[in-house]
């Protein structure tokens, strides 16, 4: 259900291969720390269509919004400039490392890192799915989620899309 909901939030149709790949990633969430540049790029490559796989943080300006009519977009958010991403992401990763050794509650840790990540939108595609994956990753790695269990993060967000998009 979590995999299906994660794709459904973004109105992305999925197939068995994409679903299986995402399930395999979710199974790694409790075993590996994905909050470093190389792992985030690898994660992005695994969850997006291969045509949209990145080899680094994005190099063009990104916007979050919606199509309101043909060739008409409503911009909700202008992401940080590409030239700022390396330092912003390095700061986020350093903060993750500090929180991991500083006794910060896993829910606060996961929330701060996931929000920081989606705020920066470092990739052209996959940022929302990665942000939700990071919640699972941090909660599992720091012992908040019981082994073998997964909280329905995406399913909960899907229940109230207006709040999720706010």
Explain the meaning of each model-derived region.
Residues 1-166:
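FIC/Doc superfamily catalytic core
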């Amino acid at each position: 259900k979590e995999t299906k909901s994660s794709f459904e939030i973004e109105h992305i149709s999925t197939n068995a291969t994409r679903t299986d790949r995402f399930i395999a990633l979710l199974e790694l969430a409790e075993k590996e720390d994905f909050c470093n540049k190389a792992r985030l790029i690898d994660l992005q490559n695994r969850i997006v269509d291969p045509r949209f796989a990145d080899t680094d943080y994005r190099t063009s300006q990104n916007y979050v919004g919606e199509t309101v009519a043909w060739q008409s977009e409503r911009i909700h958010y202008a992401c940080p400039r590409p030239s700022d991403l390396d330092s912003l992401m390095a700061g986020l990763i350093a903060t993750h490392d500090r929180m991991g050794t500083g006794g910060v509650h896993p829910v606060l840790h996961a929330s701060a890192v996931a929000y920081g990540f989606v705020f920066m939108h470092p990739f052209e595609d996959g940022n929302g799915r990665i942000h939700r994956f990071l919640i699972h990753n941090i909660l599992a790695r720091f012992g908040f989620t019981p082994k073998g269990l997964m909280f329905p993060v995406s399913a909960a967000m899907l229940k109230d899309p207006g709040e999720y998009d706010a």
